[in-house]
Every structure is written in C-alpha cells, then in structure tokens.
C-alpha cells in the first residue's frame, strides 16, 4: 500500500504543460476528467477539433422535419475507442445522463441527445467528442509528479468557448502562467 495521499480529480481540467509534452495528441491538450479513482482515470480532451459532422446523417436520424444538415464540430477525446461518442454538455439537459457533475456539466452518450440537439431541444452548450483518454492505476499520479499536467478547476464557459485553438493558451493565462517562462527541463523543487 502506498503512503501517498490520493486526490480525486473528477470534474477538474488537466492542462498539458508546454515543452514537456511536445508532440502527439496530448501536446497542448486540455482534458476534462470524467472519473478519477484509485483504480485509474478517464477523461475527454476538449480542444482537439478534427472535423464537422451532420448529426442527422451521422446518427441516422429518420425524421422529415429536419430538412437541412445539422452541422456540429467533432472533437477527438483521446486515443481509446474512437468508435464511442460522447456529448460533454451543460447540465440544463438531463435526459438519460451517463455522468452528472456538480459543476453545471454532464455527459451523455445516447441517440436521444443527438436527436434533441438536431431538433433544437438539446442542451444550451455541448461538444461532441469521439474517443477518450484513460490511465491505469497510479499512472496519472506519476504523470502529475513529473509535471506533465497542471490541474485547474473546471469552468463551463471555458469548455464551451468558440475557439478551440486558443483554449490551451487561455488555460495558462487563467492559471497565471506565461508559456515563455516554462523550462524544457522538468523537476520538483
């Protein structure tokens, strides 16, 4: 058994540190933590825009009332199970939730929410995310100890901001950090 104290990061946002994670899917990523227990962790990257999709055709919504495409951005949530889709959304929508957080956010993963969004009856804010990020027991804690991630409180307005490319820089500003002051060397004082 470990002497270390476990800090649950569910509902928090991980901010990739600059110059440490220098390439790949996690470079300048922001991850909303869905679950963090001693058995591991799961999160969704919410600033990796990959394309736009038509909800009606993607989910094969059969309804003649929707005559025009309902285009929504699609984000890459992580390297695990790209065939799984999730809606990270505001908690004003509460039908068949997969997860409900106490910070005005929820997660759904069903056809009903896509139909409701297509009909304009869905949540006020939402992101459609495919795939997710997962850590084995102790793996995220090791990454935090080696300064791969910074942790910040979640902010609904921040997650649903319009420009995904600027979210990471805005997260650093929110934390009071200037990217140019980061060293490419890692360590703890």
Swiss-Prot record:
InterPro entries: AlgH-like (IPR003774). GO terms for cellular component: cytosol. It holds the Pfam family DUF179. Signal peptide: none annotated. Belongs to the UPF0301 (AlgH) family. This is UPF0301 protein RPR_01165. It comes from Rickettsia peacockii (strain Rustic).
